[in-house]
Each structure stands twice: as structure tokens, then as C-alpha cells.
Amino acid sequence: MLREHAMYTHHCFVLACCLGAALPAPASDLFAPAELSDQELSQLRGRYVLPGRIVSFGVTMSSTWQNASGQVLGARVDLQVRQNLARPVLNVTLVDRPGDAPPPVAGNGQVLGGAGLAQTQGVSQSIRTAGDHNSASNGVSIEVRHGEAPPPLSGGTPLEGALALSGETGTVKVTPNGGALQLAIQASGQGASLQSLGAGGLVQSVALSGNRNLVQNLAALEVMLKDRPGADPALNCAWEQLRALRPSGY
């Protein structure tokens, strides 16, 4: 039986906005400045903070696939921006861990359809499975913390183009593509997963054709802000003077 779950939104998601401007198609121009149009600016919503209060800003995208034999294939992409860095840092970590048993038998399930999932805008999350006893999840998290010291920089390989890792478990590939960053896993005989962030959207998809797999896609935004400074007496005085002008019609 084919079970499908999909969710779409039509508003530009904040994570996609962050990487969309930082990931033009050529790998050599990953951090070239990109001007936002008036239409894009008109869609921005939320609260704003002064740049001096931002200690660090980071976007993480990770995918892992564990098959029935315990073999794990995956990747993690970290984009980090902080005050003392001249340019953003974009690192990739590829994972291929052996299991405690031979590779599982290829699944015989077929996942059909779903071509329209690649044509959506905004946020698209889908999990489709034609196997049994599988567990899969797509997740998005946003965390805002307060502090003075930024978290340590993540390790990994700087992303200067496509990176890939292949083995008996399958293939994992991280690729800048069309203004977005794609993280794709092709698990041998078990299915495939994809995350794509940028170009105005976020896509998370899982298609399972085998059995007893554990698949996770996660995109996370983390911001650290300085604690709000104490009130400036001169600023409070100016504010009181402005309030006093209200009865006069100003």
C-alpha cells in the first residue's frame, strides 16, 4: 500500500530566504551579494533587531539514512555567519558508517507518482513509502538564544562544488543547484531522500521502497543575540519629550 503525506505553503520561508541569497548557481559565487527585489521585501514579516545585537547566525541541513543492517549514510551542511568573520563559512560533513550485518536485501516496493512535488513553491514536505516497518521524518526548527560568545565553528570540508560519497550502502551527494543547495541520498535498494534549500523554497522528501529503514531530514535555523543593554538615560529623556508632543498633534 502506498501512503503519502505532503504539506505545502505559499509564503517564502525564512530558511530559504537565508540561503537563497547566498547560493547562486555557480559554486565559485556561493557568497556573491544578491539584491532583494521590492516584491521580496514586501513579503518580509516579523520583528527586527539591530545588527550589533547579532552574535552569530547559522543554518544547518542534515539527512541520515539507516538501513535494516545498521549501516548509516548521510550528510550535514553548516552555514555560519558571525561578527568576527569576513565571510560566511559553509562546511559539509559526509557520513558512511558500517553496520553489524551484511547489506539488506533490496526492497521490491514501488513508489509511484509524486512528480508534482518538485514543482511547488515555499515549503514542501513529503514521505512516501511502499515498504514495511519504516520510520521517516521531515523536520524544521528555529532557535533564538541569548549570549555573548558564539558557538564553536563546525568542522567539515568547505563547499566549493559538488561533494559525493559512495559505498555499498548507497550514495550521498551535496550539490549547489539552481540557486539552491541540495542534499540527496540514494540508498541501495531501499529508496531515496532529498533536501533542497534556497531559490525561494524548502523541499524535504523521502521515498521508501525497502523495509526497516530509519530516515531523518532536518533543517535548523539558530540565532544568538546579545542580551538587551540597559536603558540609556538620554534615550529615555528623548522618548519622554516625544510622548509630550502627542497632545499637540505630532
UniProtKB/Swiss-Prot annotation:
A GO biological-process term: cell adhesion
Keywords, comma-separated and alphabetical: Amyloid, Cell adhesion, Fimbrium, Secreted, Signal
What are the coiled-coil residue ranges? none
Q: Where in the cell is it found?
A: Fimbrium; Secreted
Q: Which residues form the signal peptide?
A: 1-27
Annotated knockout phenotype: Deletion of the entire fapA-fapF six-gene locus shows no visible growth phenotype.
Where does it primarily localize? other
A GO CC term attached to the entry: pilus
Q: Give the UniProt family note.
A: Belongs to the FapE family.
The free-text function statement in the UniProt record for this protein reads: A minor component of the functional amyloid in this bacterium. Upon overexpression of the endogenous six-gene locus (fapA-fapF), cells form large clumps during liquid growth, make large amounts of biofilm and produce amyloid fibrils.
What does the subunit comment say?
Answer: A minor component of purified amyloid fibrils. Fibrils are resistant to boiling in 2% (weight/vol) SDS and require >90% (vol/vol) formic acid to dissolve.
In its UniProt entry, what is this protein called? Functional amyloid sbunit FapE
